[in-house]
Amino acid sequence: MTMKRYIIGMMVLLLGLSVSAQTTYTKADSLTVCRLLKEAPAKASTLWFARQFHGVPYVAHTLEVNDREQLVVNTRQLDCTTLVETVTALTLCVKQEKRQWTDYLQALRILRYRQGVLNGYTSRLHYFTDWILDKQQMGLVEEIQRPNPPFTALQHINVNFMSQHPGSYKALKANPSLVKEIRQQEKALTGKTFRYIPKLAVKNTQLMRQTVKDGDIIAITCKKKGLEIAHLGFAVWQKDGLHLLNASQLHHKVVTEPMPLRQYLQKHSTHTGIRVIRIK
């Protein structure tokens, strides 16, 4: 019995070491994650975790720090995507009663890569629609597309931005052969349709409050050529309506936007509305 426990303990240790060996992080990152997992209430909400990152600087391209793809953990600098991934990973850890550093690494890897398998740059889910579909298939999230109204609009996916602008991506610029696989992924997404809430329907109504919940992931749809999602954040209901908690390029940090989301969307002519994703 003692030997069996020893073997199991060694397997867990080796698994943890294996995950850590393929990971880029600082001591500050691991301390932050471990502290949050320790301090989080038993039923900590998504917003509880999201609010812990208020004030963290907005920095883009934090995942592009290695020549070879590794799992990058950076809680000190966030963009809209890494904020959503970080908070979702923490939320899932607590939901599953897993509060160790290696649990978080596993959760983040499962979220960031196709079917949770890190296998080079193209295994990362670059288009958020791809992320939604993959994580929905894994039973981690659910995209809300009903009722109608407010989900009155239909988004027709037509993505090719990455394959058309490889020079804008460090890995594609350094490895042009990867563009072919990215293009295949784009073709697999193109033609799919999803219901969304048009921006004029994002109002402070009882129907909207019943449909969109605090902590839902908000994916802002857009009409920019080659892209389908412009920005990400979390839903926060306040007295004057729905707000967005996000890593803001404008504010240079993670904030809950002072203006309601309806007004925020109106200020951006390329924004068309919102898709809503709920963590299970």
Q: What is the predicted role of each segment?
A:
Residues Y58-R195, K213, W237, G241, ...:
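Acidic/His-rich structured neighborhood in mature extracellular/periplasmic domains
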Residues M1-T26:
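Bacterial Sec-dependent N-terminal signal peptides
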Residues I197-M208, C222:
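Short alpha-helix capping/helix-loop boundary micro-motifs
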Residues L207-T211, L227:
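Short, surface-exposed secondary-structure edge patches
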Residues L31-P41:
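Active-site-proximal helix-loop elements at catalytic-domain edges
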Residues D216-K280:
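C-terminal soluble interaction/assembly domains
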Residues L47-V56:
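Glycine-rich, acidic and aromatic/proline-enriched surface loops and short helix-turn segments
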